[in-house]
Amino acid sequence: MLIEVERQDDVCVLRLQGRLVTGADPAYLLAKTDEIKSQNCDKVLADLRELLSIGSTGIGFLVGIYTSVTKSPGRRFVLVGPRRRVREVLDLTHLSSVIPVVSDIASGLAALRAEGPAAQSAGEGSSVL
């Protein structure tokens, strides 16, 4: 499991790679959560294209970041490009009906940069996968 955090202009990009499942190092996940929070980003894009599998630990990590990011008005979080197996877990847990899921980076950036409160809900639960 590898989680990279980088800032690209007004967006924090999280790149998740490998397997985010039970047994993942809790200290590592806490450190990454703190790193993301310290960036104080209003817009966060989680790139899941290289995430091979996700379990309850990974779902908990994503929910924690989502909750932290979106607790203030106007802040947005989007998931990008989950593989079929990861998408199935997002659907099974209904996380994909809460957090917008899009197929590619360009769509994710467009969703994050759209104006107004309707912009976030426009992608919620929808998918172009």
Model features per residue range: what roles?
Residues 6, 80, 102:
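General small-molecule cofactor/ligand-binding pocket signal
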Residues 100-129:
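A charged, well-structured terminal subsegment
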Residues 16-18, 104:
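Active-site donor-binding loop signature of nucleotide-sugar glycosyltransferases
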Residues 20-99:
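Amphipathic alpha-helical interaction surfaces in cytosolic regulatory modules
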Residues 1-15, 128:
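Short beta-strand/loop segment at the start of cytosolic alpha/beta domains
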Residues 8, 49, 106:
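Conserved catalytic submotifs in the C-terminal HATPase_c
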